[in-house]
From Swiss-Prot:
GO terms for biological process: 'de novo' pyrimidine nucleobase biosynthetic process; 'de novo' UMP biosynthetic process. Its EC number is 4.1.1.23. The keyword Transcription does not apply. This is Orotidine 5'-phosphate decarboxylase. Belongs to the OMP decarboxylase family. Type 2 subfamily. SMART domains: OMPdecase. The keyword Lyase applies. Pathway: Pyrimidine metabolism; UMP biosynthesis via de novo pathway; UMP from orotate: step 2/2. NCBIfam families: pyrF_sub2. The lineage of its organism: Bacteria, Pseudomonadati, Pseudomonadota, Betaproteobacteria, Burkholderiales.
Amino acid sequence: MNFTDMLRAATARHGSLLCVGLDPEPARFPAGMQGDARKIYDFCAAVVDATADLVCAFKPQIAYFAAHGAEAQLERLMQHMRSNAPQVPVILDAKRGDIGATAEQYAKEAFERYGADAVTLSPFMGFDSIAPYLAYRGKGAFLLCRTSNPGGDDLQNQRLASVAGQPLLYEHLASLAQGPWNRNGQLGLVVGATYPQEIERVRSLAPTLPLLIPGVGAQGGDAAAAVRAGLRSDAPIIVNSSRTILYAGAGADFAGAARAQALRMRALLQAARR
């Protein structure tokens, strides 16, 4: 089963558009774990087990593991998700972007070392920096398009005078991803929940691509508005929430608190679908 089929199946099975982002910060762990980077796996695995039946995807952010020398814990976590939640696709949030030869190594890292079902990428260096990931048939690749951070305007909202119609950069990227770059049907786009009008614009330019929508919760994005802007019956959307769920509770039952928050978020997203 390819990534998109896995995503559709998990969305239908769990009645969910919610993705839980796994961004572990040991300083924010509950008592007994707080400040201990050796507990990254334990913390994340507990959240995964508490929410696996409520989500359409999980999204571990590689920097939160690498910063603590916890890549081995990430490998173990990926194996745990494959064993305990095999029906839920895993998106490795890596935002890689490099020349072809180096991209081949990053692709190997994402899909062979970690066994991810999809990966996030920066498309700034063009198609040849993306192609090595697409060599892994059945895997997904989400390209940064209109990101949730304010600084995204510096480049993404600039007009391209040399392109017919003078589209904004993010608009041009959406068109490329929907068209000539999507040779094997593996691409999706990252569009921040903080910009619902831009989500709607991206959806009009890329009507069939999966959209990964971060920026809900701590970043202030409107989850319901994001769903209304991006949802189509024939194209999946994934609404990511990380810190709001991970750190919903600071006590011994932090996983239970994470589940309760995930239930609330799932219900909010479901209500917006109607």
